[in-house]
């Protein structure tokens, strides 16, 4: 709801909410549409009016629907989460061109091997002992975070995004939904991943949207270190709160994601 309200203000969207209640008044689920044409934010109309200028991951759609109910979603989508698979009657996961997302493995039993965790911790220790520093992004201002992200994105990819003001507005309005760490080396930022966080009663979703790092510091593997720090911190937070971790790397677009993640299927909703 906070994201939807933010986007309504930013892009003057006309959202409409559909909510289902049990006979006793208990909330069972709901979803939001953009002007009665498509599911809000993830549809084509939202894309046309500039939603991609804001740093939101739109690779998976989890609808807030009680798993015990069955319902129809009269709008098309190809990114329905497996969480909703049993609840949405008009959905299919076998006829969706094998679409998947990459979800980070757990840092506990059944996740990363002891060898992998030891290697990541050694890399982190080497970085810290050589003049590196780790700073929680919450200690930096929205302007500082936007400047760091844009600078490191350009150093990694060779192009500089032009959405600074949108980033500042987003971070300012949704401060509690931004997560992760910034790496500094000799006082200069060298790695940062833009990650959003959304809390639910049974899980916490983390979306790694994009990031950048200073290629001149490749000897320390800053991209690997910041990834490890963020995934580990997310796991520890979920353990403390007794919730499932859903840490998304998005679509399987690069080989490195399979080293960090397991794949989960995405479904599509069929026309009714």
Please describe what each predicted stretch is.
Residues 1-39, 84, 88-96, 110-218:
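A conserved beta-strand-loop-helix scaffold within acyl/acetyltransferase catalytic domains
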Residues 97-105:
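Conserved alpha/beta-domain cores
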Residues 61-78, 234-250:
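Conserved GNAT acetyl-CoA-binding A-motif
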Residues 45-61, 209-221:
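A short, internal acetyl-CoA/4′-phosphopantetheine-binding micro-motif in the GNAT/acyltransferase core
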Residues 27, 34-55:
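ATP/Mg2+-dependent ligation/transfer catalytic cores
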Residues 72-95, 248-268:
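Conserved active-site alpha-helix within GNAT-family acetyltransferase domains
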Residues 54-66, 82, 116-120, 164-165, ...:
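Well-ordered, non-membrane alpha-helical segments in soluble/globular domains
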Residues 177-272:
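Aromatic (often tryptophan-rich) hydrophobic motifs at membrane interfaces
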